[in-house]
């Protein structure tokens, strides 16, 4: 289930017309790293993983929609960043990846 949801995010990013190819490549690389980190903790932190993936889906949706709503976009990024806070000590790479994704999407001005 989680891998399918992450694959849908990947497809959404690949199909986006609003993201430059170089930025898209970096986001897809970060998503690949996120998949690895999520897989590593999915058995021990299943509820956290559900939240992370859920907010990642929302963030991807808001970032790639044609009629953008800045308020919903900001809320989705805040939710995504908040979803990993409890894992900062035990899984710093996961937190780094999520924070990098949030910053990159935010900086793109999507």
Predicted regions, residues:
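Amphipathic alpha-helical hairpins
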Residues: 55, 64-68, 72-82
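Amphipathic alpha-helical binding modules
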Residues: 74-110
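Short terminal alpha-helical segments
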Residues: 1-35
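Short, charged early-sequence alpha-helical segments and their helix-coil boundaries
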Residues: 40-59, 69-72, 98
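A structural signal for well-ordered alpha-helices, especially hydrophobic packing surfaces
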Residues: 10-13, 17, 35-42, 56-63, ...
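Short, charged, amphipathic alpha-helical segments
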Residues: 25-29, 49-54, 74, 78, ...
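Amphipathic alpha-helical coiled-coil segments with heptad-repeat character
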Residues: 3-6, 17, 24, 42, ...
